[in-house]
A protein has these predicted regions:
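Periplasmic-binding protein-like
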Residues: 59, 136-144, 210, 214-257, ...
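Ligand-binding clefts/hinges and TM-proximal coupling segments of bilobed small-molecule sensing domains
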Residues: 41, 171-186, 224-228, 257-281
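A ligand-binding cleft/hinge motif common to bilobed small-molecule-binding domains
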Residues: 102-105, 119-127, 175-178, 199-233
Length: 281
């Protein structure tokens, strides 16, 4: 307490009596303890108290957090892993639809406790978010029309007159903005899709990663996939959390270490054809 505050209390005690002073001090002490208790309720404690883990997902992310448009059922490695995590915590998972352009708002505005849709670790994101250890790692893939004239290799992408589409907010946006020298880069905002840009002819190709390229190969009959050369960057994927409290992050870290050791991560990666990009160490 500062000097002026103490002097004010002494004046109050002389004017209204010592009993009043005691009551005031008791009230201030109670308020202080209440504030302290509130401040010490960690993210993990809230999850446990509410019996609910709010996990942000991108329901278009094939083999990661994909919602089947016909059955509305969710599947993917991160659906399986979050169910395992929830089981260990003794809570249920509530999946919150999101996407990469909403990533910061979803976490910072407390719409979810953790983003669990294979978030690529980038310098920009590290400045605003906390990340778990990596569990996947992917390079880039270009998706174009089968037998499209002049588009058979990676080198044919960055040419004058070419249009390359990326989903806004994805790590591909930053990578391609730096690497493209001749082609035009188009950022696609939801509800628009990269596929629509290519199918309509507005773009020659769109950029994606290994998991999403599986969707194009397995669910379409028009897509050709071109992998990036070895000199292009790869990105590690992890779970993301808002800055500040790290209690849930530490618990997820322990969980990821365990599923790497006991084989569950590799098991789920194989189930969803992601074993070529799984990170086990």
């Amino acid at each position: 307490m500062n000097t002026s505050f103490i002097q004010a209390l002494l004046v109050a005690s002389r004017r209204f009596g010592i009993q009043c002073l005691i009551q005031v001090m008791f009230g201030l002490t109670a308020m202080g303890f209440a504030s302290l208790a509130l401040a010490e309720t960690s993210r993990l404690e809230k999850v446990l108290q509410n019996k609910e883990l709010r996990a942000c997902i991108w329901p278009e992310y094939y083999s990661i957090t994909y919602r089947n448009p016909k059955t509305r059922e969710l599947s993917g490695i991160d659906i399986a892993l979050t169910q395992e995590l929830a089981k260990e915590l003794g809570v249920k998972v509530r999946y919150v639809d999101s996407n990469f352009s909403q990533l910061y708002d979803a976490l910072e505005q407390d719409r979810c406790d953790v983003a669990t849709h294979a978030i690529g670790i980038t310098a920009e994101r590290l400045a605003r978010l906390q990340f778990s250890q990596a569990y996947l790692k992917s390079g880039l893939f270009a998706v174009t029309l089968k037998n499209k004239d002049g588009l058979q290799s990676w080198d044919s992408l960055d040419q004058p007159g070419r249009v390359i589409a990326v989903a806004a907010g994805t790590l591909m946006e930053g990578i391609m903005a730096k690497s493209l020298k001749k082609a035009k880069l188009v950022k696609v905002q939801a509800p628009g899709t990269r596929e629509q840009e290519v199918l309509s002819g507005r773009a020659d190709a769109f950029m994606t990663d290994y998991p999403y390229s599986l969707r194009m190969i397995e669910l379409t009959d028009w897509a050709a996939v071109i992998p990036a050369p070895n000199n292009m960057p790869t990105t590690e994927y992890a779970y993301a959390f808002a800055k500040g409290d790290n209690s849930l992050l530490l618990r997820v870290e322990a969980f990821l270490s365990n599923v790497k050791k006991d084989g569950r991560l590799l098991q789920y990666a194989k189930q969803h054809n992601l074993d070529p990009i799984v990170v086990l160490k």
